[in-house]
């Protein structure tokens, strides 16, 4: 395929057009009075959302050069979403502001490499300032405030804070669609680990690509199962009970896996196999945790146990097990409360004794899975369109809340970014590096300008007043009042704010130092078939 190439200002200008199209679409959603965007779907009803990354992913432009610019900004939104789970619109606004001002200076003759260094230096300094401003989050009310600001809904804030209070900040919180119109919170005890099914033919729900097992037996072993004969006596016992089986093993391969899959497809036997979580000694400990939670025994040679001799008494049990391609969740294990509490006490003692931060983190994860649970937020709405929009809102709120617990909170509404400008005033560089710093200084004001504009206020007026206010005081765009943002509950997670700035500065610097852009030339449309000559007869017809 032949290529189309553009150089220097032509290339950057074409990409800037794409950046503007995407950013102008996304930034209308920013702030408490931001609007929604309607996305056409190839099937089903349109999606109405104000989620920046969802909108960015949908945008495809006809011009290849413009589309590359749009996709680079979409990458900023996606990266911010992956790291912090929220703040994608802020990241998009910051990227547009940095690139726009940077291109003006590059076009005027500035060195793009020097500007990029200045942008990176300013971003590092501002991020350090944001981290210093961060206030730790522990209590339920602060968690509710973060979720409320992210979702623009007090009810959603209550659901998220209740869920985190009941399962802990490290607990598992999932979001499902409710069959009714009311949104509800359901908390059940359970354990989740990062291993999915070994074959997609084991799924029972093809729409969600999930395997669901009700009241399953659970075979837990550290052995590799390659020969079906090893577990055949056990399978025959389970078959008589007409209950499903979840196999958690080192691996299932050889003839064993296709035999299990074939029986599953034929409807003879409902079975799902997953690999055991973790590695080495940590795997042994996690399998033991799972056995205690489900009331089973780890079948291992270390205890003198063999798969051929295993009976139903050695198997764990649970009310439900759900397995997707990446995760396994076991709900309401049949283990005794005393055994579980004893295990929890042992893990807590290990946490106190360990001197390794990594080991401590892994032990805390095990503790959360064993002592915590699974909280399910069941989202209800009047229509499918509203339901999809609500799910996206709650997912963003949940991610923002986790980010807040992890790194603390800062003043919301873009106030923290403007407050971070003071740290940039201490930087003194020369030439194009200083120009890059000034570009970031101006860009840090842009989220506040956009929030104000979306609420019907003049952004420049708000920024002028904000510069003279005390640190932490900001503009509440919902009410039009100047308030202490933290006291008013208008807060953003520090992780979200700094991730948005870091990712925006990174991609903006790359765009500014671009000197050539190579794109595929559009293929010429195939010529239409010429009309048939009416004088020509139809062969074989009278």
UniProtKB/Swiss-Prot annotation:
Q: How does it assemble?
A: Forms a cylinder of 14 subunits composed of two heptameric rings stacked back-to-back. Interacts with the co-chaperonin GroES.
Query: Which residues of the sequence carry a binding annotation for ATP?
Result: 29-32, 86-90, 413, 476-478, 492
Molecular function, one GO term? isomerase activity
Q: What is its EC number?
A: 5.6.1.7
Q: Which UniProt keywords apply?
A: ATP-binding, Chaperone, Cytoplasm, Isomerase, Nucleotide-binding
| NCBIfam families named among the record's database cross-references | GroEL, PRK00013.1, PRK12849.1, PRK12850.1, PRK12851.1
Q: Name one GO cellular component term.
A: cytoplasm
Spell out the reaction equation it catalyses: ATP + H2O + a folded polypeptide = ADP + phosphate + an unfolded polypeptide
Q: What does this chain do?
A: Together with its co-chaperonin GroES, plays an essential role in assisting protein folding. The GroEL-GroES system forms a nano-cage that allows encapsulation of the non-native substrate proteins and provides a physical environment optimized to promote and accelerate protein folding.
Annotated family? Belongs to the chaperonin (HSP60) family.
Q: Which Gene3D superfamilies match?
A: GroEL (3.50.7.10), GroEL-like equatorial domain (1.10.560.10), TCP-1-like chaperonin intermediate domain (3.30.260.10)
Q: What is this protein called?
A: Chaperonin GroEL
Question: A GO biological process this protein is involved in?
Answer: protein refolding
């Amino acid at each position: 395929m032949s290529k189309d190439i553009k150089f220097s200002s032509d290339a950057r200008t074409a990409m800037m057009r794409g950046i503007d199209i995407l950013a102008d679409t996304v930034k209308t959603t920013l702030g408490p009075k931001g609007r929604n965007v309607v996305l056409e779907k190839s099937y089903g009803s349109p999606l109405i959302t104000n989620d920046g990354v969802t909108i960015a992913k949908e945008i495809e432009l006809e011009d290849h050069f413009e589309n590359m610019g749009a996709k680079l900004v979409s990458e900023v939104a996606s990266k911010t979403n992956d790291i912090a789970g929220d703040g994608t619109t802020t990241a998009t606004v910051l990227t547009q502001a940095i690139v726009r001002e940077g291109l003006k200076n590059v076009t005027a003759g500035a060195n793009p490499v020097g500007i990029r260094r200045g942008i990176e230096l300013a971003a590092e300094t501002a991020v350090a300032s944001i981290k210093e401003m961060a206030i730790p989050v522990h209590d339920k009310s602060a968690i509710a405030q973060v979720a409320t600001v992210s979702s623009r809904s007090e009810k959603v804030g209550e659901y998220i804070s209740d869920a985190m209070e009941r399962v802990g900040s490290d607990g598992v919180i999932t979001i499902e669609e409710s069959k009714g119109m009311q949104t509800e919170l359901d908390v059940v005890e359970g354990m989740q680990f990062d291993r999915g099914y070994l074959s997609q033919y084991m799924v029972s729900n093809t729409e969600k690509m999930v395997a669901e097992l009700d009241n399953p037996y659970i075979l837990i072993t550290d052995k590799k199962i390659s020969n079906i004969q090893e577990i055949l006596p056990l399978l025959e016992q389970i078959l008589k009970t007409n209950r499903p089986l979840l196999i958690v093993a080192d691996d299932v391969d050889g003839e064993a896996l296709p035999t299990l899959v074939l029986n599953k497809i034929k409807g003879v036997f409902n079975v799902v196999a997953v690999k055991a979580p973790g590695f080495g000694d940590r795997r042994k400990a996690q399998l033991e945790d799972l056995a205690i939670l489900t009331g089973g025994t780890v079948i291992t040679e270390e205890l003198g146990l063999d798969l051929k001799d295993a009976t139903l008494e050695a198997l764990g049990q649970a009310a439900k097990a759900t397995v997707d391609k990446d995760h396994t969740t076991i709900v309401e294990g049949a283990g005794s409360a005393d055994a579980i509490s004893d295990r929890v006490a042992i893990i807590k003692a290990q946490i106190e004794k360990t001197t390794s931060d990594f080991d401590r983190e892994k032990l805390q994860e095990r503790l959360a899975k064993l002592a915590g649970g699974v909280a399910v937020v069941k989202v209800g709405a009047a229509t499918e369109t509203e339901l999809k929009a609500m799910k996206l809102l709650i997912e963003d709120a949940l991610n923002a809340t986790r980010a807040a617990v992890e790194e603390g909170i800062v003043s919301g509404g873009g106030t923290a970014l403007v407050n971070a400008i003071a740290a940039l005033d201490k930087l003194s560089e020369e030439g194009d590096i200083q120009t890059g710093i000034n570009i970031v200084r101006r860009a840090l004001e842009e989220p506040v300008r956009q929030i104000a504009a979306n609420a019907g206020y003049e952004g420049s007026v708000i920024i002028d007043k904000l510069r003279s206010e005390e640190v932490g005081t900001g503009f509440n765009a919902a009410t039009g009042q100047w308030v202490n943002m933290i006291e008013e509950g208008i807060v953003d997670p520090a992780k979200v704010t700094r991730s948005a700035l870091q990712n925006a500065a990174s991609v903006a610097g790359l765009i500014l130092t671009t000197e050539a852009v190579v794109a595929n030339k559009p293929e010429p449309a195939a010529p239409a078939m010429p009309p048939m000559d009416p004088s020509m007869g139809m062969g074989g017809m009278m």
